[in-house]
Amino acid sequence: MDHQLTREESQRLMHLLKLPMEQYGNFPLMRKAFLRACKIVHPDKGGSDELSQELISLYRRLEESLPCLSTQDFIETDKVCLIEKIDYLTDWINCNFENCNKCLYCRLWNNHKSDPPFPKVWGYCLCYKCYIIWFGLEPCHFAFQSWMQIIALTPFCA
C-alpha cells in the first residue's frame, strides 16, 4: 500500500465524488460516484481539465493502493447464511469480552485478530474497531448503526 492517499487527498477525493467521508472505503459506491463525477467534470461536457485530471489521478492512486482480493480476504458466508436473520451484535458485554462467535461483530473481530499483524486498514478489515479507528469516531450507538449500514451494503464473497 505504498501509494495510499493522504488524509487531505482522501478528503479532496470524497469532495470531488460528492460523498460524505463516512463512505470512504465503500468501494462499489465510490466507483459509481467516480463514473458519475467523470461525466460532470469532463472538459467536453463543460468541466475543468484540471479538475478532471485531479479526480482521475486521485481515484487511480486509490485503486492502485487496494490489495488484491482473494478468497482468503472474505469471511465464509455459508456459515452466516444458515441464519435467517443475521445478528450484528448478540450482547455488548459478551461480544466485547467473551467473543460469542455467533454474531457478525465477533466473526469480523476474530478475523481481525487472526490476520497478520501489519497495520489494519478500513476496507481490508471490516471489523467495528477498525471502522471507528479509521474514521476517528467515538464508540457509540450512532457509530455502530453507521457501521451496520455499511456492512449491510458490502458484498461478501459466497
From Swiss-Prot:
GO terms for cellular component: host cell cytoplasm; host cell nucleus. Keywords: Acetylation, Activator, Early protein, Host cytoplasm, Host nucleus, Host-virus interaction, Metal-binding, Oncogene, Phosphoprotein, Transcription, Transcription regulation, Zinc, Zinc-finger. Its main location: host cell. It is found in: Host cytoplasm; Host nucleus. GO terms for molecular function: zinc ion binding. Residues 12-75 form the J domain. It comes from the Viruses. The modification N-acetylmethionine is found at M1. A zinc finger (C4-type) spans 95-106. A zinc finger (H1C3-type) spans 112-130. Interacts with host PPP2R1A; the interaction inhibits PP2A activity. Promotes efficient viral genome replication by accelerating both G1 and S phase progression of the cell cycle. Inhibits host PP2A by binding to the A subunit, thereby displacing lower affinity regulatory B subunit. Inactivation of PP2A in turn results in the transactivation of cyclin A and cyclin D1 promoters. Late during the infection cycle, ST may induce dephosphorylation of host MTOR, leading to the inhibition of cap-dependent translation. May establish and maintain high levels of viral genomes during persistent infection in cell culture. The common region of ST and LT proteins comprises the J domain. This domain is essential for multiple viral activities, including virion assembly, viral DNA replication, transformation and transcriptional activation. This domain is also required for cyclin A-transactivating activity of ST. This is Small t antigen.
